[in-house]
Amino acid sequence: MLKKLGIVVLTLLLCGCSNGVQLKKQMFTIELGKDIYANPTLYLKNATYSSRLKVVSKSVGIDKKNNRFMTSGMDYLVVGEYDFAIRDGNKEYPFVIKVKDTTPPVCASDVSEIKVGVGQNIDWNSYFHATDLSGVTFEANVDTSSASTQDVQVKISDRFGNSVTKNVS
């Protein structure tokens, strides 16, 4: 009887001393446009009891669809910091997901030469077909006031400063 009691006490001590839910880290940084899943195992050191756990958003304006978190009205979470928690019954373990944009715009076309008329405005996107989840802007120092051949660098940027430079003549 004393042996059984000792085993029960030891089991309770071992179970009671375990930390249970342990996050891999307090802040997770994810690239803009990447899926942010509501799967607890992605954020835990030990996923032994993950079937009873749930990832919940603590930030407003976030929807959960198909086990993914996204900004309301979008297919992804926009750039920013978001509060989440792993819920285990009535206990919550908070963490942050930081969404960053570090990727430059992508150009569908690689143009090396263009011809424009004197005084013509240039629609750079019609040549490069650049895309980025954060939008794109074009910057080029070109003079179309007279006929000439020019070597021009076109800087294609997103609103977070990521850019790519294309050379055209």
Regions found by a protein language model. Name each.
Residues S18-V60, T103-G135:
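Solvent-exposed, low-complexity, repeat-rich "mucin-like" stalks and linkers
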Residues L13-G16:
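C-terminal motif of bacterial Sec signal peptides marking the signal peptidase cleavage site
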Residues L10-T11, K100:
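Residue-level signal for mature regions of secreted extracellular proteins and peptides
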Residues T48-Y93, L133-V168:
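Serine/threonine-rich, repeat-prone extracellular segments and beta-strand-based repeat modules
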Residues M27, E92-V96, V111-E113, T165-S169:
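Well-ordered beta-strand positions in beta-sheet-rich domains
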Residues I97-T103:
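Interdomain boundary/hinge segments at the C-termini of tandem beta-sandwich modules
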Residues M1-K4:
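Positively charged n-region of N-terminal signal peptides that target proteins for export
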